[in-house]
Amino acid sequence: DVARKLGHTEDAAFFADRAGKLRRAYGPTFLNPATGVLAGWRSTDGQLHDYWFTFVNGVAITYGLVDDKDARPILDQLLAKMTAVGYTNFELGIPGNLVPVRKGDYIFHDNPPEVFGVPRLEDGSDGFQYYENGGATACYAYFMVKALYQVGRKADARRLFEPMLRSFATGDFQGFCDNGMSKDWRDWHGGCHGYEGFLVDSFLPLLAVFDEWETRR
């Protein structure tokens, strides 16, 4: 789009061609038929690594790598999985993944599981809900909310988004808790497990205010 608007026609054609190829390859490469959602990555051995990533699927849908007709069943699966695993407290944000990341998919194993979610058990369960191993956060939660608005699922989008707005209003995505860890990453019971204190990515969901506004015009 930028190249086209600047009159760089050759660049625009190049990028459009590559975008088309990426779009055609993305679904067949990453959609996991066993779960009905997009995996996080495919390793060199061909194996899909799928931990029910909410942000991966949200980003892909938001940026048009998945058609709306294919996006709706993906979102249905993610919402159903959230219910199945018992995640309901959207005032804490949205977990980046809904099942534990296995130990074998981590590179470093130096910290206790409850610090950064790095597991010691092979199935990853001891690190689950901590930091980027299923911790609840507003970081990149925007894309799940945006994807729901984009395909016309207003009620579902609001169910996730409105509790987060209440937390933004009270400053609950910034600062530190009594344990010295910050509020930008929490376990599902609200315990703090972040370290930055003010994670700017956590404020992306506020962009969805414009999507909500569009639904009311």
Show the residue positions of the predicted features.
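Active-site core of glycosidic bond-cleaving carbohydrate-active enzymes
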Residues: D1-T9, A13-G20, G27, L31-N32, ...
